[in-house]
Amino acid sequence: MKVSLSVIKQLINFELPPVDELVQRINQQLGKVDRVENLAERYRGARVVRVVECAKHPNADRLSVTKIDDGMAVPDVLRDENGLVQVVCGAPNVQADMWAVWLPPTSTVPASILEGEPFTLDARKLRGVLSQGMLAAADELAIGTDHEGIVALTPRDLPAGKALQPGADFAALFGLDDYVLDIENKMFTHRPDCFGQLGVAREIAGILHQPFTSPTWYNLEQVFGDGDSVPLAVSNDIPQLVPRFMAV
């Protein structure tokens, strides 16, 4: 079972100990932690950028030469007179004024870390044109399987209260600056109260001898209305195979 420490922190009102210490306590009193994933490290260096310019590559039909605005957040990269960074991109959906995710030189492609063969980017020429890092697709960021184009960010993709800003840390913006603990499933077979982040948060509070208060929504009594309900008709077309069929 995967447990997000970011979610756990939202459910408690005390400070967690360092990750190594917390893992040790969980191992001793709850169950074995098979793996600890540091998402912040996986996405280290990834930045939100705006594509300011997009032109056809002079030496390749399927490549584009872009100029991106990273808010001057990344040091030690070549910039033009306007402070923009040049990146060559092969995605068919790249265009000016879109928002994308940039992996600058010295950063590592997140998907390659998961594959066990970390690939670190650098500044290099592609068909004679300098490209500083890459604009990433969903599969390269390990957030999806799409490789047909780069990730196109829009305001509706963001968590509430967040805004697209050039140079924003991708992991921090999307809540990926997190640790995920993978706790063995066998431990939970006799602990159905831990079948979820809330139950694990309660258990961690107990392990650390801290008080725990369930969120308000957890204690609300469910009320089922009968005035504005949507009409629902249910029929059983195969009673010989399904003698009892119910809808709730």
Which residues does each PLM region occupy?
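Phosphate-backbone binding interfaces of nucleic-acid-interacting proteins
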Residues: 1-224
